[in-house]
From Swiss-Prot:
InterPro entries: LS, LS/RS, LS/RS_sf. The gene is ribH. This is 6,7-dimethyl-8-ribityllumazine synthase. The active site is at residue 89. GO terms for biological process: riboflavin biosynthetic process. It comes from Chlamydia muridarum (strain MoPn / Nigg).
Length: 157
């Protein structure tokens, strides 16, 4: 039996982080967590691109534009923060952002991780940004690196 499993190693891996600016203090923490994890995993500054968009809804469109430029990245980490309000706006945005990212990942056969916090309130969002527990941006980067490594192994088969 052959087992293929990726490793969270960033050496020679080109990665992009697409981070929403809305809910900036929390979103910035996700982007920082992803960036720090990339460098801790052996990545070089020349191999990392950070793109900031106004809000989470703009993430899939920015990713699609980046991917239309060719094979520039081996993985993408999507970071954003959506906090539930009193209307259904939150559900519409969360559903469409998640579906858009998933669709692009499959369409381009590229690891695109969903490090978008969907929280009922600000306190819960901060917890998911690493205040009490793991930083979703950091875990998204680890997953992206593992998947990029796995895809490389699969291509060599």
């Amino acid at each position: 039996m052959k087992l293929l499993k990726g490793l969270p190693v960033a050496k020679d891996v080109r990665v992009a982080i697409v981070g929403a600016c809305f809910n900036a203090p929390i979103a910035d923490r996700l982007v920082s967590g992803a960036r720090e994890t990339f460098f801790e995993s052996g990545g070089s500054p020349d191999s990392l691109t950070v793109v900031r968009v106004p809000g989470a809804f703009e993430i899939p469109c920015a990713i699609k534009k980046m991917l239309s430029k060719g094979n520039l990245f081996q993985a993408i980490v999507a970071c954003g923060v959506l906090i539930q309000g009193e209307t259904s706006h939150y559900e519409h945005i969360a559903d469409n952002v998640a579906a858009g990212i998933a669709r692009l990942s499959v369409e381009f056969c590229l690891p695109i991780t969903f490090s978008v916090i969907t929280a009922p309130n600000v306190e819960a969002a901060w917890e998911r940004a690493g205040i009490k527990g793991p930083n979703l941006g950091a875990s998204g980067m680890r997953t992206a690196l593992e998947m990029a490594s796995l895809f490389s192994l699969i291509e060599k088969e």
